[in-house]
């Protein structure tokens, strides 16, 4: 539907009127080349139009990135930069390292090993890209650990709040996350954990 939103801006407004307030948008890089491995026409330039049309309709975007080693892993930093620069239209990216299952039965073991990418790779690649500003050991934690923060935020809003915070009760090995805060005026950012002495 990203391509349709780019071609038909009114579709985004119709979706908003029907109650849609957030979408997941496949986002494998900040260039057409980094999106070309999907062999579809909804490349980066089309996604940019879709992002603008969704934002104009008041729909928030979560960019979803399938990271494949040797294909678009060099894009994880630029994707973060893009999301920060467009924070008024989208949230942080949801990186999903490639998983070879199901319909990927024809993938050879050599290709599987060559293209494998894990959340640990992601944490270290972002640390290198940002010269250590994101620490792979200090700043990353299991997704489910944010549930306590979500519960606290819900409690602070009180029982009259319209909608609660998102929480994830998944297995600790299911995924990892890092939280950042950014100054909308200056664009400066820091990881939340960098404000604390964890020692």
Report each predicted region and the residues it spans:
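Radical SAM/AdoMet-radical enzyme domain recognition
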Residues: 1-97
């Amino acid at each position: 539907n990203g391509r349709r939103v780019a071609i038909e801006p009114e579709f985004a407004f119709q979706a908003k009127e029907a109650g849609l307030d957030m979408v997941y948008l496949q986002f494998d890089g900040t260039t057409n080349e980094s999106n070309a491995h999907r062999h579809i026409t909804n490349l980066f330039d089309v996604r940019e139009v879709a992002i603008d049309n969704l934002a104009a309709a008041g729909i928030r975007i979560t960019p979803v990135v399938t990271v494949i080693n040797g294909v678009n892993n060099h894009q994880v930093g630029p994707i973060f930069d893009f999301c920060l620069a467009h924070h008024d239209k989208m949230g942080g990216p949801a990186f999903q390292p490639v998983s070879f299952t199901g319909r990927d039965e024809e993938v050879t073991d050599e290709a599987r090993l060559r293209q494998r990418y894990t959340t640990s790779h992601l944490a270290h690649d972002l640390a290198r890209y940002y010269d250590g500003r994101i620490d792979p050991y200090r700043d990353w934690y299991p997704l489910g650990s944010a549930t306590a923060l979500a519960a606290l935020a819900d409690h602070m809003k009180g029982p009259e709040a319209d909608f609660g915070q998102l929480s994830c009760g998944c297995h600790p090995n299911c995924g990892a996350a890092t939280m950042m805060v950014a100054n909308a005026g200056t664009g400066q950012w820091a990881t939340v954990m960098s404000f604390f002495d964890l020692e």
